[in-house]
UniProtKB/Swiss-Prot annotation:
The protein's name in its UniProt record: Purine nucleoside phosphorylase
Any further remark recorded for this protein: Although this enzyme belongs to the family of MTA phosphorylases based on sequence homology, it lacks several conserved amino acids in the substrate binding pocket that confer specificity towards MTA.
InterPro entries registered for this protein in UniProt: MTAP, Nucleoside_phosphorylase_d, Nucleoside_phosphorylase_sf
Recorded metabolic or biological pathway in which this protein acts: Purine metabolism; purine nucleoside salvage
Organism: Streptomyces coelicolor (strain ATCC BAA-471 / A3(2) / M145)
Keywords: Glycosyltransferase, Purine salvage, Transferase
Binding site for substrate: M194, D218, L219, D220
Any one GO cellular component localisation term in the record: cytosol
Length: 280
């Protein structure tokens, strides 16, 4: 039974991925930061132990700005995950990134404003310990090994991905104005979403490998001339592509190295700095 509550890879995604796992065990995990979005669902994918966490909770009841990102990443690490895949829906900021495009970003820009985004905030933990001030590098926020696995998996499924680009993360839950969208595009950014930060930053602080896979579900307001983005259209395009994305995730999981064989810098992100708290 102990094996059933352990995983080496985490996947944070939407409700369309529940059927992703075989032989599923549901596990409730408590964290010093409160409960994660939902239970962890642990099972096997391509012979690998995987923990799936529904980012918005069952029934999609958590808006992006109210997701407990710190608890989510902490929970995944606590069951053994050291590599995390984070698929999410985004809007395309350029006409060439239309609905159905899979973009694997290599950068992000944070335009959120109210989300706790670090474990090292100097505030006491419930047990009284106080984290030290720690500054991790986020120059390259995504795991190079995970990105390579995701790109190879997509190509193997005959879905040519966009290799690289910048994901701008906004607060939500509203969609952007045309002025905001045009400004994002003018900066040279590629896609816009609501959940990519602080996942990547928190994963780095926990020395986890994190890879974002963004599925374009719509052209953002500044890239189209219609009535703007609608939630219904986002859901329709996501549903039309979820099977393909599941297949890419399946193959990416199979291609990731064993946790003890990681050769990327993610596992040494703290660089020997003392976090002042016991990581799970």
């Amino acid at each position: 039974m102990a094996n059933k509550v352990k995983a080496e890879i985490g996947v944070i995604g939407g409700s369309g991925f529940y059927s992703f796992l075989d032989d599923v065990t549901e596990v409730r995990v408590d964290t010093p930061y409160g409960p994660p979005s939902d239970s962890l669902f642990l099972g096997e994918v391509a012979g690998r132990r995987v923990a799936f966490l529904p980012r918005h909770g069952r029934g999609h009841h958590l808006p992006p700005h109210r997701i407990n990102y710190r608890a989510n990443l902490w929970a995944l690490r606590s069951v053994g995950a050291r590599q995390v895949l984070g698929p999410c829906a985004v809007g395309g900021l350029r006409p060439e990134y239309g609905p159905g495009t899979l973009l694997v970003p290599d950068q992000f820009v944070d335009r959120t404003r109210s989300r706790p985004s670090t474990y090292f905030d100097g505030l006491p933990m419930p047990d009284g310990t106080v984290p030290n001030v720690v500054h991790v590098s986020l120059a390259d926020p995504y795991c190079p090994t995970g990105r390579a696995a995701a790109l190879k998996a997509a190509r193997g499924r005959e879905w040519e991905p966009v290799d690289g680009g910048t994901l701008v993360v906004v607060e939500g839950p509203r969609f952007g104005t045309r002025a905001e969208s045009l400004w994002h595009r003018a900066q040279g950014w590629s896609v816009v979403g609501m959940t990519g930060h602080p996942e990547a930053a928190l994963a780095r602080e926990l020395e986890l490998c994190y890879t974002s896979l963004t599925l374009v579900t719509d052209l953002d307001a500044g890239a189209e001339s219609g009535e703007g983005v609608s939630h219904e259209e986002v859901l329709r395009v996501f549903a039309a592509n979820v099977d393909r994305l599941r297949g890419v995730l399946f193959d990416a999981v199979a291609a990731l190295p064993a946790s003890g064989e990681r050769d990327c810098p993610c596992g040494a992100a703290l660089g020997g700095m003392d976090p002042g708290i016991a990581l799970p």
